[in-house]
Amino acid sequence: MKVDVHTHILPERLPDFRKMPGGERFVRIEHHAPGRARLIVDGSSFREIESNSWSVEARLAECDAAGVDVQVLSTVPVLFSYWAQPDPALDLARRLNDHIAGVVAAHPSRFAGLGTIPMQSPELAIRELERCVRELGLSGVEIGSNVNGANLDSPELFPIFEAAASLGAAVFVHPWEMAGRDRMTRYWLPWLVGMPAELSLAICSLIFGGVLERLPALRIAFAHGGGAFPATIGRIVRGFEARPDLCAVSNGVSPREYLGRIYVDSLVHEPLMLRYLLDLMGPDRIALGSDYPFPLGEARPGELIDSCGFPEKTRARLLHGTALEWLDLPAARFGGAASRGRGPDQG
């Protein structure tokens, strides 16, 4: 069975918020050809998308063709809208969450869902987080790697993580609004350089700021294999040991200890890096993720894992076992995989 924890979806239509304060910054969908649309931000085209971004039928057909049994659905990060006034941001989040919940409810053996919350208003974010879990039946939430430039250890954000831990909600951190993006205007550098750096910044902030130490029950995962954090763990630990006066002011536990407490997806694009991640973190911390349906993702989810020749027990853990543990979902919910030729213990 393959459970893909990193996939994005959005409704075919979005509300027009242009009359709201800052309304031009809200994303609009401009359908310009059959099965094709543009995401419009600030009056300019941000990204070209195809019907698999919104059509459940197209998505299921592509999942079947690629051998993916379950997708974990989350919104497209450009829709986070943390910059917006809290009320319209909450309105948008509720619409996006209702849409994801509807897709999951219609196909419970093929999808699980993560909501989005207005992180710029912790009170509203917690309220919507509770609704996502208690009313909509979603497994948790996807959040950005910073909130309008505030790192994730900012004190005002702690109650959100505390609520997630209390609710048993999974948290998926996706890079967005990358640091240094003003210097990365060419060559797709925000995606190639900014995102890995942004994720390391998020992880280090949560560790050094003591958030993960204070909330040991928090099930938190990071996209793109945790970005640059795993590759630079030696440097980070050395800095922690050499300058505790700078690094250990809020948490005296070594960053290395958290390699066994956070989750990452498998989207690292390179067999050597995936093997390194496995050696560093173990299979219980790595879950299949593809970034479907976007071009920097893995076109055939699980192909990188399969290419490494891992033992079957390890392979099964990477393809679905870790995902189900992070989401706190039983394999039996997705038992339909067996009727599609792949049981819970098969790839």
Regions found by a protein language model. Name each.
Residues 228-233, 237-238, 272-273:
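Short acidic/glycine-rich loop or secondary-structure boundary segments that cap or lie
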Residues 8, 176-177, 226, 293:
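Catalytic metal-binding/acid-base residues of hydrolase active sites
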Residues 69-206:
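Active-site gating/metal-coordination segments in enzymes
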Residues 49-54, 81, 119-125, 148-155, ...:
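Acidic-and-aromatic substrate-binding clefts and catalytic sites of carbohydrate-active enzymes
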